[in-house]
């Protein structure tokens, strides 16, 4: 009886396995369509005579960083921006970032949206590429901003001549 039982169980298993193979539909193979290059972001031109248009240099000592953080920001009237930073520790200067993108001021909030970092196109949806500051004061030769976070640091920049570059 056990050999009949084993034979029957073997036949049932074989039928189930074959039935499973017959009932399955072949998986359709779809090729991934390559994504096209991301569409460039359209910058919004600044208002005519906007006092923030120009070249701004700041030198600060961020919390938790031992050294001077230097930043050069160029804000163009057409809404484009270029942002370059370097960190100076003692006599050594370390270049950090070279970013380009768009800028705007809405309701007293200055926003920089990076579209390229060190020559590479970035994911515009990534929040690391958006910097926001409250505009505290804009003078002819001085710009005062505050980071938009609890206990945000004040950043003071001074206007530089067009074409000014960071000292290396």
PLM feature segments, named:
Residues 1-19:
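Sec-dependent bacterial lipoprotein signal peptides
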Residues 7-10, 21-106, 111-168:
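Lipid interaction determinants
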């Amino acid at each position: 009886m056990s050999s009949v039982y084993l034979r029957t169980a073997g036949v049932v298993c074989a039928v189930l396995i074959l039935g499973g193979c017959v009932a399955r539909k072949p998986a359709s193979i779809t090729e991934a369509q390559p994504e096209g290059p991301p569409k460039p972001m359209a910058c919004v031109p600044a208002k005519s005579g906007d006092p923030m248009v120009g070249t701004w240099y700041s030198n600060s000592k961020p919390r938790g960083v031992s050294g001077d953080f230097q930043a050069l920001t160029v804000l163009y009237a057409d809404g484009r921006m270029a942002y370059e930073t370097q960190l100076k520790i003692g006599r050594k200067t370390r270049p950090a970032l070279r970013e380009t993108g768009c800028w705007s001021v809405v309701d007293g909030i200055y926003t920089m949206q990076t579209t390229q970092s060190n020559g590479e196109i970035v994911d515009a949806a990534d929040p690391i590429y958006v910097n926001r500051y409250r505009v505290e004061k804009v003078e002819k030769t001085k710009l005062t901003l505050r980071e938009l976070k609890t206990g945000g640091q004040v950043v003071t920049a001074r206007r530089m001549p067009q074409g000014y570059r960071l000292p290396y």
